[in-house]
Curated annotation (Swiss-Prot):
Marked site positions, Transition state stabilizer: R17
Protein's name according to its UniProt entry: 3-dehydroquinate dehydratase
InterPro entries in UniProt: DHquinase_II, DHquinase_II_CS, DHquinase_II_sf
Originating species: Lachnospira eligens (strain ATCC 27750 / DSM 3376 / VPI C15-48 / C15-B4) (Eubacterium eligens)
EC number: 4.2.1.10
Entry-linked HAMAP family: AroQ
Lineage: Bacteria, Bacillati, Bacillota, Clostridia, Lachnospirales
Similarity comment: Belongs to the type-II 3-dehydroquinase family.
MF GO annotations: 3-dehydroquinate dehydratase activity
């Protein structure tokens, strides 16, 4: 079982930016949590982060060629406007995908209430902090096993 966990813009600044929203833990702590969860699930995991839209699209396309079984993605701000990321996710329709957000985007600024990417994902986890990634990983493994 291969899982790709993808993070978009500014996720690498966890523990630095807006601690009241995103918490005190840094990006390395998140990666460590993800790796531990993958071990528990018996899965191989690749964790990827980029502040660049094209790099995220390239990684989604690579997932197809690398026989990735499931994708967990936090597109960051690309969630709200990147039809290019949305189309890349749609192009790998056979791969289960869960969108995750650390904060509850539905209770924040109005522009955050819309996700152009979630309609091409199997589900969404929001507002559960960094643990949301772990729940998303469980869900994507479950979906992949049902394929």
């Amino acid at each position: 079982m291969k899982i790709l966990v993808m993070n978009g813009p500014n996720i690498n600044f966890l523990g630095i930016r807006e601690k009241g929203i995103y918490g005190e833990q840094n990006y390395e702590a998140l990666v460590s949590m993800i790796q531990k969860k993958a071990e528990e699930l018996g899965a191989d995991v690749e964790v990827f982060q980029s502040n660049h839209e094209g790099a995220i699209i390239d990684k989604i396309q690579e997932a197809y060629y690398n026989d990735v079984d499931g994708i967990v993605i936090n597109p960051g701000a690309f969630t709200h406007y990147s039809y290019a990321v949305r189309d890349a996710l749609a192009s790998v329709a056979a791969i289960p995908k869960i969108e995750v957000h650390i904060s509850n985007v539905h209770t924040r600024e109005e522009f955050r209430h819309t996700s152009v990417t979630v309609p091409v994902c199997n589900g969404q986890v929001v507002g559960l902090g960094l643990k949301g990634y772990l729940y998303a990983m469980e869900a994507v493994v479950d979906l992949a096993m049902k394929k």
